[in-house]
Amino acid sequence: MRYGFFDISQDFITIFCPKKTLKNCMFGLIGSRTQATLRQEKNQNFSFFVNEANEIAGFNFFDIKKSFRRGLISHHFTAGLNYPSLKLVKKISELLNYDLTPLAKKVPFVVCEVISAIPIPNTHLKRCKVNTGSNKSLDVVCGADNVRVGLKTVLVHVGGVLPDGTIIKKAKIAGYDSMGMLCSEKELNLKPKNQGIIEIKSHIKIGKSFLDVYLNNSEKFSAWVSTKKRVTGN
């Protein structure tokens, strides 16, 4: 499916609410659209960035209390799981007068299962295939010592954005394609910050939104994350 000049499968909306540095501000980024030349258009309370295909690539709200009702912007954005609910996307679309709702169901962080993990000679890396619940497995290069066949963990798709602002792109690592990234708790800004990629318990469904898993179980962390000791990270 095409959306302008970009593959919509790589378009994920990421939200940042940096409460410690810029109170009441919200920043939005649409991952794969950032490579285009942007221009800025301003409004009294927000600005947005438009690429050459006339698609919105990012937006800023300078006073979220003026634009969004209380509770619509969830606290979970500060936990690193920074992509919005459908309700929030609808409200943003209304304010920007631009329909972003086709992207609302695109989930960048999902539960996956490692189905193969082959060591790459002369490196600490493994070329992995992961099952995300779709018809096609994905190739991902990972350097975590605890990556192994049968492990359920968190995949961030190409076009997803980490809490530190890193955009995940298709990459070639040690000569192999890598279509995403397997994540550690540290990379998702979650606690406890164990080493290695996240180990999710086997009863959690493959393909499930990791945001849903986290929000439903955040007070009982051990309900979905293995508590076995981890080793060095990726």
Swiss-Prot record:
It holds the Pfam family tRNA_bind. CDD domains: tRNA_bind_bactPheRS. Keywords: RNA-binding, tRNA-binding. Residues 103-211 form the tRNA-binding domain. It comes from the Bacteria. Transmembrane segments: none annotated. The keyword Transcription does not apply. InterPro entries: NA-bd_OB-fold, tRNA-bd_dom, tRNA_bind_bactPheRS, YtpR-like_sf. GO terms for molecular function: tRNA binding. This is Uncharacterized protein MG449 homolog. It comes from Mycoplasma pneumoniae (strain ATCC 29342 / M129 / Subtype 1).
